């Protein structure tokens, strides 16, 4: 072990090992696929409570609503949603 070493394997040695690539050849694509499905099925919208893209505006509106009173913004938006 070299002076000042923490006892960990060097990064280059890790990424050039066959064991690393056997493990990561499965886990990295699985994480990507899971994330893609999480977003594409709409589960992300439900999990985080964000509105879906088609519910940002009501059908009668053509642009984003403008809040005119800073401290009464919630009341203005609630009135808009009724």
UniProtKB/Swiss-Prot annotation:
Membrane-spanning ranges: 22-36
Pfam (any one): Cytochrom_B559a
Main location: membrane
Signal peptide: none
Cellular component terms per the entry's GO annotation: photosystem II; plasma membrane-derived thylakoid membrane
Gene Ontology terms describing biological process: photosynthetic electron transport chain
The organism's place on the tree of life at top rank: Bacteria
Keyword DNA repair: no
Membrane topology: Single-pass membrane protein
Residues where heme binds: 24
Alphabetized GO MF terms: electron transfer activity; heme binding; iron ion binding
Record's cofactor remark: With its partner (PsbF) binds heme. PSII binds additional chlorophylls, carotenoids and specific lipids.
Record keyword Transmembrane present: yes
Keywords recorded for this protein, A-Z: Electron transport, Heme, Iron, Membrane, Metal-binding, Photosynthesis, Photosystem II, Thylakoid, Transmembrane, Transmembrane helix, Transport
Cell location: Cellular thylakoid membrane
Cofactor(s) needed by this chain: heme b
Database matches in SUPFAM superfamilies: Cytochrome b559 subunits (SSF161045)
UniProt xrefs under InterPro entries: PSII_cyt_b559_asu, PSII_cyt_b559_asu_sf, PSII_cyt_b559_N, PSII_cytb559_asu_lum
Subunit structure: Heterodimer of an alpha subunit and a beta subunit. PSII is composed of 1 copy each of membrane proteins PsbA, PsbB, PsbC, PsbD, PsbE, PsbF, PsbH, PsbI, PsbJ, PsbK, PsbL, PsbM, PsbT, PsbX, PsbY, Psb30/Ycf12, peripheral proteins PsbO, CyanoQ (PsbQ), PsbU, PsbV and a large number of cofactors. It forms dimeric complexes.
Function: This b-type cytochrome is tightly associated with the reaction center of photosystem II (PSII). PSII is a light-driven water:plastoquinone oxidoreductase that uses light energy to abstract electrons from H(2)O, generating O(2) and a proton gradient subsequently used for ATP formation. It consists of a core antenna complex that captures photons, and an electron transfer chain that converts photonic excitation into a charge separation.
The family this protein is said to belong to: Belongs to the PsbE/PsbF family.
Protein name from the UniProt record: Cytochrome b559 subunit alpha
Species this protein is from: Prochlorococcus marinus (strain MIT 9211)
Gene: psbE
